[in-house]
Amino acid sequence: QRQMCIRDSFYGVQTFLQMVNEKKELPVGTVTDEPRFAYRGMMLDVSRHFFDVNFVKKQIDAFAYYKLNRLHLHLTDAAGWRIEIDKYPRLTEFAAWREFPTWKEWWNNGRQYSEEGSENAYGGYYTKEDIRELVAYAESRYITVIPEIEMPAHSEEVLTAYPELSCTHEPYKQADFCVGNEKTFEFLENVLTEVMELFPSEYIHIGGDEAGKASWPTCKLCQARMKKEGLKDVNELQSYLIHRIEVFLNGHNRKLLGWDEILEGGLAPNATVMSWRGTEGGMKAVESGHKAIMTPGEFCYFDSYQDAPDSQPEAIGGYLPLSKVYSFNPVPDTLSAEKVGLVYGVQANLFTEYIPTPEHAEMMIYPRVLALAEVAWSAPSKKNYEDFHVRALKAVEELKKSGYNPFELKNEIGNRPGADKPVEHLAVGKKVTYGLDAAYYPGYAAGGDTALVDGVRGGWTYGDKRWQGFIDKKRMDITIDLEKETELHFIGADFMQVCGP
C-alpha cells in the first residue's frame, strides 16, 4: 500500500511539472486523475540497431515523465543478439555482431555475422551488469523492463552460432528452432533462466511471431514430435513449444507474453497476447478469458512515416501521424462490460530496420509517444486532439531543450493533398469491369469493385485501404462504363509503387 502511494505521488509530480508554464506559473485548481490502463508501454528494438545504456536511460526519463510504466526491450532477432548469456558465449562473441552498421546494408549484402573485434564488425550487447543497471534505473521511475527472447522464429543469429538447434544443422540457412529437438528446449530454458535472474518483471516476452515453419514438415525430429504428441499440423507444433515454455515460466512464477501468432494452434492457458496484426487477435484472446495488450500496427508502429514521406528520412513505409496515434481506442464498443478489464493496456513499438542513429530513433518516438501515453492514461471522453496538439507543440520545444531530437511538429505537412476530400468526376459510381486474370489482389481490395470510381483518393500509404493493389499478374485491365457517349476532357489515375527493402 505504501509503495502504491509513493508511485501515485510520483505520477502526481509529473502532472504538476507538465502544468507549469514558461513563466513558472501554475493554474489554480484540483486534479483528480487515474490511469485508464494498468499497462502503458513502449517497445524499443535494440537488435536491428543497438542502443547503448545511456540512450536507453535517457528514454526511460522521458517515458516516466509521460507516465508510461513498461519498457519492452526487443533483445534478440536476426540482426543481432543483445544480452550476455554465460552458458552460451557465442551469442555475444559472434551473434551480436554483423558486417554492416545499417540493417538495410546488412540485409541486402548476404546477412553475414562477424566475430567480436573483427574489422568492420558492427553491433554490441548488454552485459549482465548493464541489464541490472537499466532495470534498477527504470524501477526507480516506476517502469518495469520486459525482456523479449524470440522463439521459435526470428532466430537466424542463434542458429548460425549454434546450428545444431535448427532442423538442418546448417548455418545461415534457418530462422526457426527445431521444435523436435530436446536440445532446443535445453537451450531456451537455460537462456530464460539467466534472463529471469536479471529481470524481475511479471512477464517474459517470447516473441512467437512470423514463424515460417518451412523445415518442420520434412524434419524427422519435428515429425516424430508431432506423432508422439498427437499434433495435426505445424501450427499445433508451434503451440506445443509455446505451451511448454509457458509451463517452464509459470514454474518460476513468471507469465508468458507473446505476439498474437501465439494464438495459432491453441493459446497457452495463462498467456497474455500482444495484438499487433490489428486488434482481432487481442479480441480473440479476451473473448476466451485471456488478457490482451493492444499494439496494432495501424496505430502503434512508430517505424512508419509520421509525415509526407518525401519530407522524411527513409522509413519502413506506412503513414502514422500524431493525430492517428491519438485517435486510437484500444477497447472496441462491441466488447461486453465484463470483458473490458481483460484489455490490460496499450503499447507503441519502434522497430529499427530503418533507424540508423539514436537521433533518428528519437525523431520517430517523439512526439508520437505522447499521444500513445494519453491514449493509455485518459478516458476517451477526456480527450481532445486540438487541445492535445497545442500541448504537443509545447512538449516538442521542451524535449529539444532537454537534449532530445523530436520531430518538428510545427512543420508538419499532413496527409497527401486531396486525400481528405472527395473528387468529383464523370466516372463516380459507374460500373467497373476487370479483364480476365487482371483483377485486383484480394489483400488490397480497398473498396472492392467500386474503389476506383468512389471519388476518394488514397493517402500516403496503401494501409489506408484506399489504394487497390495489382501484384499477381503485374498488369491491370479495367473498363469503366459511362453508360452513354460522353465528351472527355481528361483521363487520369493515381499510382503508388511500393518496392521491398
Predicted region positions:
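Short, small-residue-biased leader/transition segments that mark boundaries at the very start
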Residues: 2-6
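Substrate-binding groove of N-acetylhexosamine-processing glycoside hydrolases
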Residues: 133, 142, 153, 185-203, ...
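Flexible loop residues that form catalytic
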Residues: 76, 209, 351, 374, ...
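Residues that line or immediately flank small-molecule/substrate-binding pockets and catalytic motifs
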Residues: 46, 75, 350, 436, ...
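Substrate-binding cleft of carbohydrate-active enzyme catalytic domains
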Residues: 38, 42-254
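Disordered, acidic Ser/Thr/Pro-rich linker "stalks" and the adjacent N-terminal cap
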Residues: 415-488, 496-500
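N-terminal carbohydrate-binding accessory modules
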Residues: 12-37
